[in-house]
């Protein structure tokens, strides 16, 4: 299988190195990643600016752009053979609930899904400094080898692995997205007149406790796998909204 590996933590991150080290033993891996940290960039693309792309060797490229840029160049830049699977991660920190709308990790995988590739985003709850993520990568390899034939194109499979996990498929749970809440704080530095610099000082993160969600699985020590559709239409409201507007216009 031809696997494009990318992330939003940058080319030097331990998570992407672990995926490549483990997967290249049995698959053809092609690594293309941002030059620097690009967290919370979702599916941003560089459409007005050129991007500097550096070829390290035949299968390694660095892009001065966003994670979705990396996927786009990997798929359409005539540098790799046809890619079967877009694999994004392993992210240092989880992406669950509403996180998925901001995440560059998930955004990169979603871009693969837009272009009809199998797409998997992987995040870890282990944010220990200098951790190597090899155990997580081995689990991902096992999952791909066992189940990739059952996955569908046009779907993003979002996997979150707890800090202390049992590396067994019996520990995997298929989940839905939970509800994340954010309480953001900013610091401000006044420059001159009405000009000021704002810095996101941090976010207090909470989540709802509900059965069947990624949060519930994760915090009970299970590995969550959530299938994410590209179609974000709220089907339940389509007819209701149509009927409501029709009545108001009649």
UniProtKB/Swiss-Prot annotation:
Binding residues annotated for a divalent metal cation, in chain numbering: 8-9, 39, 91
The protein's required cofactors: a divalent metal cation
Cell location: Cytoplasm
Assigned GO CC terms: cytoplasm
Enzyme class: hydrolase
Pfam families: SurE
Catalytic activity: a ribonucleoside 5'-phosphate + H2O = a ribonucleoside + phosphate
Alphabetical UniProt keywords: Cytoplasm, Hydrolase, Metal-binding, Nucleotide-binding
InterPro entries: SurE, SurE-like_Pase/nucleotidase, SurE-like_sf
Cofactor stoichiometry and binding remark: Binds 1 divalent metal cation per subunit.
MF term (GO), any: metal ion binding
EC assignment: 3.1.3.5
HAMAP family: SurE
UniProt-listed PANTHER family: 5'-NUCLEOTIDASE SURE, 5'_3'-NUCLEOTIDASE SURE
Record's function text: Nucleotidase that shows phosphatase activity on nucleoside 5'-monophosphates.
NCBIfam families per the UniProt record, alphabetical: surE
UniProt record similarity statement: Belongs to the SurE nucleotidase family.
UniProt-recorded name of the protein: 5'-nucleotidase SurE
Source species: Leptospira borgpetersenii serovar Hardjo-bovis (strain JB197)
Lineage of the species this protein comes from: Bacteria, Pseudomonadati, Spirochaetota, Spirochaetia, Leptospirales
């Amino acid at each position: 299988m031809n696997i494009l590996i990318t992330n939003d933590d940058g080319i030097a991150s331990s998570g992407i190195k672990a995926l490549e080290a483990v997967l290249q033993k049995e698959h053809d891996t092609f690594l293309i990643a941002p030059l620097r940290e690009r967290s919370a960039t979702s599916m941003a693309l560089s459409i007005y600016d050129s991007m500097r792309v550096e070829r390290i060797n035949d299968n390694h490229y660095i892009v001065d752009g966003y994670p979705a840029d990396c996927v786009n160049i990997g798929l359409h830049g005539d540098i790799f053979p046809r890619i079967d699977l877009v694999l994004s991660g392993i992210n240092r920190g989880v992406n669950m609930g509403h996180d998925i709308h901001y995440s560059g990790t998930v955004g990169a995988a979603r871009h693969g899904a837009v272009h009809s590739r199998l797409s998997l985003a992987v995040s870890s709850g282990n944010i220990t400094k200098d951790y190597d993520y090899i155990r997580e990568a081995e689990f991902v390899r096992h999952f791909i080898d066992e189940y990739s034939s059952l996955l569908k194109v046009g779907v993003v499979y979002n996997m979150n692995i707890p800090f202390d996990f049992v590396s067994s498929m019996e520990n995997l749970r298929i989940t839905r997205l939970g509800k994340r809440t954010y309480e953001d704080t900013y610091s401000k530095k006044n420059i001159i007149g009405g000009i000021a610099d704002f810095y996101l000082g941090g976010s207090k993160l909470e989540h709802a406790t509900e059965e069947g969600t990624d949060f519930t699985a994760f915090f009970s020590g299970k590995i969550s796998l959530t299938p994410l559709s590209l179609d974000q239409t709220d089907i339940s409201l389509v007819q209701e909204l149509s009927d409501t507007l029709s009545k108001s216009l009649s």
